[in-house]
């Protein structure tokens, strides 16, 4: 009886142990399959890795090592539009239709390499043209161009085209196509080089033709330079024309013909300046202009409505050219005349003096480095006794001596308009210096008097300097207190009128 119940207990325990073993085996199986499946699922392919691994950089709200980082990941729509406008500006220039703040952003991002056909008449922003100038030229003197960067760009761009133009080789449309783009901005043209045509080698001729004695016919090349008439006629605001007919940096290819101002050039230039009614300043220097060519040019300037300054210095002008200039003084509103370093002598200076005695416009006359001598110097001194407008006179290097100094001394006692007088590099001498000292002692208006290398004694130079210092101090006081130095006659006149 006791053994019978023990059997089922053993069998039940056995079955429980078997069940327990099966559960453990199944558990082991499940545990073994579980990590295996997890392991296989945790090793994704490279493509799955890119999509499932989070971007730690985007999750960080502050990135201290990146000073330009911003939490705004997507740019504003306006910024995208501005970027698109800048990128496609050459094909679709949209600027005036934008608000002012957006225009500034577009202009600040535009590249300076855009074609002038797009930007010339559309963009007026000085900052943009400033970037264009700085990118193209290392040295930029914007003050010489009225303080405008846009004007500077177009003036210098046009000048570069003119300097490199080769007649017969360069296409004239290169310059004429620029005219509609720059006509409103160019006020000054300064060209210090005009290239001549390229000299082509003469073809070999047969013996029969060479023996005929005509081998030189037609072999001389053209020497005329670029003609400015069409260009200047299209520049409606042109005020200054500064030209030099020569070649720079010619090196071993130097020839005198490179510096030739031909008659065709002269006639064309004369017609050009005559038709330009806005021209105020005309300069033609270092171009071998002789009397005949000077007369042609000056004839075209008679009764010019706007001309105020004429500079023909460093040329070959003699007395005949000086007489033409004297006639111009009576038939123009010229205020500045520069004939320095020419071939003027006494007759030419006398012609100028005769016109100067009755002139009421000229304030600056430069005759240095000529040879007017005492006859011409005395004539000018006589003219200044009656002239009431000239304020600057330069007679340096003209072989003047004591007789001229005597008359200049008399002139200084009565002249009240001359402010600057230059007699340097002459033979004034000690006696002439003393006479000038006597004359300037009674003069209260002259502020500059140059007597260097004129054989004047140091004592006279010192005393003249003291007089000039007193005149400058008085002029400064008049500038600071203009009402205090008003003349009594003016006050009486004003009181009587009141």
Curated annotation (Swiss-Prot):
List where this protein forms a coiled coil: none
**InterPro entries xref list:** DRC5 (IPR052410), Leu-rich_rpt (IPR001611), LRR_dom_sf (IPR032675)
Please list the tissues where expression of this protein has been recorded: Testis-specific (at protein level).
Q: What GO CC annotations are associated with the protein?
A: cytoplasm; cytoskeleton; sperm flagellum
- Stretches for region Disordered: 27-52, 200-223
SMART domains listed in its UniProt record: LRR_RI
Cellular localisation: Cell projection, Cilium, Flagellum; Cytoplasm, Cytoskeleton, Flagellum axoneme
Query: Keyword Repressor, does the record have it?
Result: no
Q: Spans of LRR repeats, please give.
A: 276-299, 306-327, 333-353, 361-382, 389-409, 417-438
- What UniProt keywords are attached to this protein's entry? Cell projection, Cilium, Cytoplasm, Cytoskeleton, Flagellum, Leucine-rich repeat, Repeat
Describe what happens without this gene: Male mice are sterile due to asthenozoospermia (sperm with diminished progressive motility) and the diminished motility is due to aberrant flagellar function, with sperm tails contracting toward one side and generating a circular path for sperm.
Instruction: Write out the biased-composition intervals (Low complexity).
Output: 28-47
Asked if the Swiss-Prot or TrEMBL record annotates the protein with the keyword Isomerase, the reply is no
SUPFAM superfamilies, per database record: RNI-like
Q: Identify one Pfam family in the record.
A: LRR_6
Q: Name one GO biological process term.
A: flagellated sperm motility
Query: What domain of life does the UniProt record list for this protein's source?
Result: Eukaryota
Task of the protein: Component of the nexin-dynein regulatory complex (N-DRC) a key regulator of ciliary/flagellar motility which maintains the alignment and integrity of the distal axoneme and regulates microtubule sliding in motile axonemes. May play a role in the assembly of N-DRC. Required for sperm motility.
**Assembly and partners?**
Component of the nexin-dynein regulatory complex (N-DRC). Interacts with DRC1. Interacts with FBXL13/DRC6, DRC3 and DRC7.
State the family named in the UniProt similarity comment for this chain.
Belongs to the DRC5 family.
Q: Please give the name of this protein.
A: Dynein regulatory complex subunit 5
Q: Which organism is it from?
A: Mus musculus (Mouse)
The protein's gene is named Tcte1
